[in-house]
């Protein structure tokens, strides 16, 4: 009996349940798979970076808005403080002005008594003390004879003409004026004199004649 030699046409032993495809060697992974994974990771990182950048921009915007709000509140507070201080000073000045206004008749009496030589003894000391206190509170007296009339600080009670004045002039102080700082609490009550009508023309003619007399005349030979 002749022994049979296995030929090439015989199929190798294949485990049961396996297919011919399983018997074939598997192909190695392609080289493009790794770059694809790196690209996905890079894209994810870029997305995260973009998200963080957007959040940072939002935080910066919110910080800028809060900073602007704080600066605005600080400016409003400073304006409020200045306004309160200004109002406080104004109220104080009004209160002082009202008090000193009530004292003006007494100061007028003191002035008249001084003019008539009646400011003597204890009354003189009291009067001078009152005037000193009023001056410390900012009261200033104004109004002098011979100064030009100013309707903003003078009140003309008497009016006349005078040949020796060149403009409306205070010729008598009937009642002195008083002010506190730049605020006038009572104008000076005065008598005023205006230039005599025609007086300036006469004076000009006289001056011209005097000049002619000094410069003219026949020359001596």
UniProtKB/Swiss-Prot annotation:
Residues 26-44 have a biased composition (Low complexity). CDD domains: GrpE (cd00446). Its main location: cytoplasm. Pfam families: GrpE (PF01025). The keyword Protein biosynthesis does not apply. Belongs to the GrpE family. HAMAP family: GrpE (MF_01151). Participates actively in the response to hyperosmotic and heat shock by preventing the aggregation of stress-denatured proteins, in association with DnaK and GrpE. It is the nucleotide exchange factor for DnaK and may function as a thermosensor. Unfolded proteins bind initially to DnaJ; upon interaction with the DnaJ-bound protein, DnaK hydrolyzes its bound ATP, resulting in the formation of a stable complex. GrpE releases ADP from DnaK; ATP binding to DnaK triggers the release of the substrate protein, thus completing the reaction cycle. Homodimer. This is Protein GrpE 1.
